[in-house]
Amino acid sequence: MSMIKNYLVSAWRNMMRSKLYTVINVFCLTVGISSAILTALYLNHELSYDRHHEHQDRIYRIDGVYHVGGNTSHMAITAFALGPALKLEYSEIQEYVRISPIPDMLIQIEDREFLEQGLAFADSTIFDVFTHEFVYGRAMGSLSEPNTAVLTRSLADKFFGDVDPTGSTFDANGQTFLVKAVIEDLPDNSHIRFDGLLSIRSGGNQDAIYSVEPRLFWSISMNYTY
């Protein structure tokens, strides 16, 4: 015990003799430890992305390679018909989902209006591919019909208040949508961001939505495919 005490006394005396070097060393040590802790916290957060999904190790996002004017670009945006085509071609693909973000959508509920930027069209299979916690309603059939919607808790509270909004309706760009379910807000460590989902079957030619034949749906590249 006395030996340890002697070491401590000796170390303290040496520190007092070279105060400037002591301050520099302590500062550098503090910076090093702080940097290591911050780096570990950052890596832990980055590596936690999308780990909340039950099938996270089997989910893949398709990227597109585009050649325009001699330039090659890699983007996550893919053709509308790619999902159905890949499922027909490869038996290993159990399911796919297309998510098409909507830049701006005017929402009307009675005499109130909202300009929302966090909505997206999606296939009903989104809840088979990704895991979400349901507050009201259920996953089955929630987006299978045209003009149906699933809202996050925050958006549902914004539109309808702190009540169960399933069965309620709202108008969006001239169409009326029926709220089928409410899910919890997406966690911060999710690379997919949306406040609400609208059935991808809303509007247009319903038979063509899942077709791989029409040339039009190969030329449209406006969605993410998983």
Can you say where each PLM-predicted feature lies in the sequence?
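Mid-to-C-terminal secondary-structure elements
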Residues: 123-136, 149-226
